[in-house]
Amino acid sequence: MFPRPLTPLAAPNGAEPLGRALRRAPLGRARAGLGGPPLLLPSMLMFAVIVASSGLLLMIERGILAEMKPLPLHPPGREGTAWRGKAPKPGGLSLRAGDADLQVRQDVRNRTLRAVCGQPGMPRDPWDLPVGQRRTLLRHILVSDRYRFLYCYVPKVACSNWKRVMKVLAGVLDSVDVRLKMDHRSDLVFLADLRPEEIRYRLQHYFKFLFVREPLERLLSAYRNKFGEIREYQQRYGAEIVRRYRAGAGPSPAGDDVTFPEFLRYLVDEDPERMNEHWMPVYHLCQPCAVHYDFVGSYERLEADANQVLEWVRAPPHVRFPARQAWYRPASPESLHYHLCSAPRALLQDVLPKYILDFSLFAYPLPNVTKEACQQ
């Protein structure tokens, strides 16, 4: 899926190349790893480069980027990666009727990934990462040795259902329809559980995939679920958020009434590398430059993309991705639009740098929060 990297992009107006700036720029609180020197977060630096070269904030203000259509995330072409020759070859890689245009868009998205990841200083391998970043990555990649695939799970992007599928494939569960409370650790193997040589072998030879979601919609889903339903999160995070950002909150708030703008203010002040996994940027969870994923599925096409992956890895025909429950009400584009339009514009502009690589790498348009759009 990732051909040879393109020639690095020229820095705007004679500026430093991306990788050199990564090595030189200070970060403040964020650190590369245990005892490592400070590093500038790639998302922050990438945002600064984009702003300097193309006036991104002005485009956000005018709603220009919001008019861009998201690029559908679809199967890779036939050009080989290691897994195809050394793991069971999934059948039916040819495009379905009517998918040719979608393949073109997928190719455009791949060029974006190659252009960003091909910059000097960007990681090419998990062992290029600082210790802390590599630890986070390896703890989020699940392993199926029986079906020879690796799945980087992203919270709030159907990861519980994928873990349920993996337990069925491992013979731990009889069916994906078993409605037991999901244990997110037991009977699952993570790359972090393996020795370095075992990790390298699987990264080279196994089919690798992840699923992504519109970044702010994912944040809204985490906000609604964790602060609206789960007492542990209300006590651990909600109470602290209220103390920090609400005037006259008192010393012991319950944390069960955090507003979305308060949550966004909290995210602005957090180091992305140390965030809770439910709102950590996908870039930091799955490191798509360090790991060359064969497929990136999307939440918007969840069931179709997931079942395509199961065909590719030759899962038994009776194992299908669970259908969404009738009672489930996910965060919708309409709900997201309402919450974003209710938040201060300046606050949104402060939040976007944390997630700009998730928008750009995975081809999601930036939100349109102009006055005109919010009045509709």
Swiss-Prot record:
E.C. number(s) listed in UniProt: 2.8.2.35
Effect of substituting P281L: In EDSMC1; loss of activity
GO molecular function, one term: sulfotransferase activity
Lumenal compartment spans: 61-376
Topological relation to the membrane, as annotated: Single-pass type II membrane protein
Positions of 3'-phosphoadenylyl sulfate binding: 155-161, 213-221
Glycosylation site residues: N110, N368
GO cellular component labels: extracellular exosome; Golgi membrane; membrane
GO terms for biological process, alphabetical: carbohydrate biosynthetic process; dermatan sulfate proteoglycan biosynthetic process; dermatan sulfate proteoglycan metabolic process
Topology feature Cytoplasmic, residues: 1-39
Disulfide bonds: none
Major localisation: Golgi
Source domain of life: Eukaryota
Residue stretches spanning the membrane: 40-60
Catalytically driven reaction(s): dermatan + n 3'-phosphoadenylyl sulfate = dermatan 4'-sulfate + n adenosine 3',5'-bisphosphate + n H(+)
Pathology noted in the entry: Ehlers-Danlos syndrome, musculocontractural type 1: A form of Ehlers-Danlos syndrome characterized by distinctive craniofacial dysmorphism, congenital contractures of thumbs and fingers, clubfeet, severe kyphoscoliosis, muscular hypotonia, hyperextensible thin skin with easy bruisability and atrophic scarring, wrinkled palms, joint hypermobility, and ocular involvement.
Sequence similarity: Belongs to the sulfotransferase 2 family.
Function: Catalyzes the transfer of sulfate to position 4 of the N-acetylgalactosamine (GalNAc) residue of dermatan sulfate. Plays a pivotal role in the formation of 4-0-sulfated IdoA blocks in dermatan sulfate. Transfers sulfate more efficiently to GalNAc residues in -IdoUA-GalNAc-IdoUA- than in -GlcUA-GalNAc-GlcUA-sequences. Has preference for partially desulfated dermatan sulfate.
Alphabetical list of PANTHER family matching this protein: CARBOHYDRATE SULFOTRANSFERASE, CARBOHYDRATE SULFOTRANSFERASE 14
Name the record gives this protein: Carbohydrate sulfotransferase 14
